[in-house]
């Protein structure tokens, strides 16, 4: 964004200092919590506000959209990109007992219990309209779980998403499963135990191993729905 719009000032926030050090001169990172009542900025400060993949981050994402409306200039735009946590399938290759589907269901339960819901994507458009945005638009895209698709573009996206899911699976799981659902660590992550008889695994130890196998199974044609919603703050407020 900073490279494409060199005359703009780009401000980004996060809860911790994990941002790269090498960024365009017009890009600035701040440690801040968007759920705070005051963004420490004057009203109508921004021309454009963008959010992406914040499912599970806030108790009320609709309130974040309301805040975005408040801090936008009249005529400014806000855009949100969120994926539905529950995977979909169009050809019945994803059974009800598919391990990754079960994993997402447990994650949803934990997120609701923690008052940080994951299922927000399908509510974005309504929240935008309720906040006062006009000309609200929505597009829904398919993001394959892995590279199962015959379409080259979707295959590439799926391969990238599979890598992301596999690399982040343990981290995604630990907080929800251990702190919220009270699973023990060995119920969450597998550890191979060596013995004179070879490698042996117990049921509780193979949980994430099975999830990883499910994610990489090309025979299951599953995908996430990605909702992209944007809207304009009216030039004049009634």
Model-identified regions with their sequence ranges:
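Short SAM/SAH-binding signature in class I
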Residues: 44-53, 79
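Conserved NB-ARC/NACHT P-loop NTPase core of NLR-like innate immune receptors
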Residues: 1, 6-7, 13, 30-32, ...
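Eukaryotic intrinsically disordered and solvent-exposed regulatory patches
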Residues: 14-17, 34-36, 51, 66, ...
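Short glycine-centered segments of the SAM/dcSAM-binding site in methyltransferase folds
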Residues: 9, 76-77
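C-terminal lobe and adjacent flexible extensions of AdoMet/dcAdoMet transferase-like proteins
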Residues: 131-238
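Class I SAM-dependent methyltransferase SAM/SAH-binding core
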Residues: 1-48, 62-66
């Amino acid at each position: 964004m900073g490279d494409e719009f060199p005359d703009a000032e780009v401000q980004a926030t996060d809860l911790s200092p994990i941002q790269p050090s090498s960024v365009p001169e017009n890009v600035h990172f701040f440690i801040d919590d968007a759920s705070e009542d005051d963004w420490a900025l004057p009203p109508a400060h921004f021309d454009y506000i963008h959010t992406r993949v914040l499912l599970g981050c806030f108790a009320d994402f609709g309130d974040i959209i309301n805040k975005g409306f408040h801090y936008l200039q009249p005529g400014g735009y806000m855009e949100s990109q969120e994926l539905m946590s529950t995977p979909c399938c169009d050809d019945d290759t994803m059974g009800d007992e598919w391990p990754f589907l079960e994993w997402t269901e447990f994650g949803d339960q934990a997120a609701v219990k923690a008052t940080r819901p994951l299922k927000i994507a399908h509510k974005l458009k309504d929240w935008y309209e309720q906040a006062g945005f006009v000309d609200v638009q929505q597009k829904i895209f398919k993001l394959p779980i892995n590279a199962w698709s015959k379409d080259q573009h979707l295959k590439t996206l799926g391969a990238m998403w599979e890598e992301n899911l596999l690399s982040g699976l343990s981290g995604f799981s630990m907080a929800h499963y251990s702190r919220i659902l009270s699973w023990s660590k060995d119920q969450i992550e597998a550890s191979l135990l060596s013995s004179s008889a070879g490698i042996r695994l117990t049921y509780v130890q193979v949980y994430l191993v099975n999830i990883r196998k499910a994610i990489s199974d090309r025979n299951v044609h599953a995908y996430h729905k990605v909702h992209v919603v944007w809207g304009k703050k009216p030039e004049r407020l009634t």
